[in-house]
């Protein structure tokens, strides 16, 4: 590998693909008779990644196998094997339903909507976002916390179908074969077990409104959002073949599950129950529909979600893998940012272990990793553009603990020293 160097125009090397000189690129790789720059290598990798996606959706008459879907999910999501299998099978069956409906009409295959339950930061939303990358059907994500009953301030449930239409460029036929992910579904649980004279417009009312579109109905969707344009023409969208995936953290559900089956008594003969010391993800494995009813979901809504997948808590090992292994791993992202300043960013193994421990202490799962790294690298990213001689930045465990500054390695290796910025 040859780096840019030398000012003699006769000895200047050029990339054989894009024509840039060795002075215009970071690195130039030499072959027997040709050269290729780092930018062209990146472009080639992007092309290969796109082709691998297209080969996925063309296998077996356009129906990707569960293993193929799982393989792509593994590239971005660490752990959660059970949830990946459930999603892979569900999406595979969704494709098969669509193919079957187009060829046969003797047996009607019903869809199986999915409910994902897992602690915060366990990867529910990331799984859905990763599915969106690999599917050849329209995909949209909605937030249940913004939904209200029709006629109240907030979004109507029909807006979910509108987003799916927008994702399909208003092609109704394609939208009717799409997949919808509704996040924060636990936030629309019934606010109380007892009926109330006041309407629960963002809880049970939204569940009631979602029932029809999840089961299958012809929804009238205003293409511009109905409330501000009441006179517009409505589009008719059949939701029968739209797959719905719902996800939520369901905070407090673990207590309902743990309490199930434990007899309660008072007085001298009462049985003292030991506290359940299992992790939240372990408790979620034993969830039953009756637990969801006690949590606040109405029976009809639970019945529309026959497939249930639970996600595990992420332990220290999994969080370290999340930092380093996926294609969009946080460490790789920050290393790329530093490469733009011609600086190599290195994390010591003990430092990554401490970052994972901090995320566990905060109980934010993988979602908390970015904020931890941002706080660690803030001063360095602020100072780096003005430091021309720095070639490498090393993050050790003391930096994560806030007891030291990152180690700056300058172009002159004899100048290895901590950052010159004062505390």
UniProtKB/Swiss-Prot annotation:
> Which superkingdom, per the lineage?
Bacteria
GO CC entries: HslUV protease complex
For the keyword Metal-binding, the answer is yes
Which SUPFAM superfamilies does the UniProt entry name for this protein? Glucocorticoid receptor-like (DNA-binding domain), P-loop containing nucleoside triphosphate hydrolases
One GO term in the molecular function aspect is: ATP-dependent protein folding chaperone
Q: What keywords does the record list, in alphabetical order?
A: ATP-binding, Chaperone, Metal-binding, Nucleotide-binding, Zinc
Instruction: Keyword check for Transmembrane, yes or no.
Output: no
What Pfam families would the database entry show? AAA_2 (PF07724), ClpB_D2-small (PF10431), zf-C4_ClpX (PF06689)
- Which InterPro entries does the UniProt entry name for this protein? AAA+_ATPase, ATP-dep_Clp_protease_ClpX, ATPase_AAA_core, Clp_ATPase_C, Clp_protease_ATP-bd_su_ClpX, ClpX_bact, P-loop_NTPase, Znf_CppX_C4
Which parts of the sequence bind ATP?
119-126
Q: Where does Zn(2+) bind?
A: 15, 18, 37, 40
Q: Name one GO biological process term.
A: proteolysis involved in protein catabolic process
Residue limits of the ClpX-type ZB domain? Answer: 3-56
Summary of the function given for this chain in its UniProt record: ATP-dependent specificity component of the Clp protease. It directs the protease to specific substrates. Can perform chaperone functions in the absence of ClpP.
**Family membership:** Belongs to the ClpX chaperone family.
Self-association state and partner proteins as the record states: Component of the ClpX-ClpP complex. Forms a hexameric ring that, in the presence of ATP, binds to fourteen ClpP subunits assembled into a disk-like structure with a central cavity, resembling the structure of eukaryotic proteasomes.
Give the protein's recorded name. Answer: ATP-dependent Clp protease ATP-binding subunit ClpX
Identify the species of origin.
Answer: Methylobacterium nodulans (strain LMG 21967 / CNCM I-2342 / ORS 2060)
């Amino acid at each position: 590998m040859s780096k840019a160097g030398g000012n003699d125009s006769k000895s200047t090397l050029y990339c054989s693909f894009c024509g840039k000189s060795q002075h215009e690129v970071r690195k130039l790789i030499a072959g027997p008779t040709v050269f290729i720059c780092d930018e062209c290598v990146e472009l080639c990798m992007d092309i290969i990644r796109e082709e691998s996606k297209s080969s996925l959706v063309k296998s077996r008459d356009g129906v990707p196998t569960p293993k193929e879907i799982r393989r792509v999910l593994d590239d971005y999501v660490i752990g959660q094997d059970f949830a990946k299998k459930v999603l892979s099978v569900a999406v595979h069956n969704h494709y098969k339903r669509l193919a079957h409906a187009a060829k046969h009409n003797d047996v009607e295959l019903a869809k199986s909507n999915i409910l994902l339950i897992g602690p915060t930061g366990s990867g529910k939303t990331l799984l859905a976002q990763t599915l969106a990358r690999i599917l050849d059907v329209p995909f949209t994500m909605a937030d249940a916390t913004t939904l209200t009953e029709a006629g109240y301030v907030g979004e109507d449930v029909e807006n979910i179908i509108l987003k799916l239409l927008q994702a399909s460029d208003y092609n109704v036929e394609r939208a009717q074969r799409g997949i919808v992910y509704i996040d924060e579904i636990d936030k629309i649980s019934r606010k109380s077990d007892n009926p109330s004279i006041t309407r629960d417009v963002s809880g049970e009312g939204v569940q009631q409104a979602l029932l029809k579109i999840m089961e299958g109905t012809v929804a009238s969707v205003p293409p511009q959002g109905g409330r501000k344009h009441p006179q517009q023409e409505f589009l008719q969208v059949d939701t029968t073949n739209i797959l719905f995936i719902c996800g939520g953290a369901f905070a407090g559900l673990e207590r309902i599950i743990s309490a199930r089956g434990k007899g309660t008594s008072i007085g001298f003969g009462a049985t003292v129950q030991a506290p359940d010391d299992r992790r939240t993800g372990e408790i979620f494995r034993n969830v039953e529909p009756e637990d969801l009813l006690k949590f606040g979901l109405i029976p009809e809504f639970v019945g529309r979600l026959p497939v249930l997948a639970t996600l595990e808590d992420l332990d220290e090992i999994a969080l370290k893998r999340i930092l380093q292994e996926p294609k969009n791993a946080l460490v790789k992202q920050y290393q790329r940012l530093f490469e733009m300043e011609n600086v190599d960013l290195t994390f010591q193994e003990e430092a990554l272990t401490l970052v994972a421990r901090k995320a566990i202490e905060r109980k934010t799962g993988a979602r908390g990793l970015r904020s931890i790294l941002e706080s660690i690298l803030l001063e360095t990213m602020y100072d780096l553009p003005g430091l021309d001689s720095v070639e490498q930045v090393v993050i050790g465990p003391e930096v994560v603990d806030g007891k030291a500054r990152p180690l700056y390695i300058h172009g002159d290796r004899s100048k290895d020293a901590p950052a010159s910025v004062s505390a």
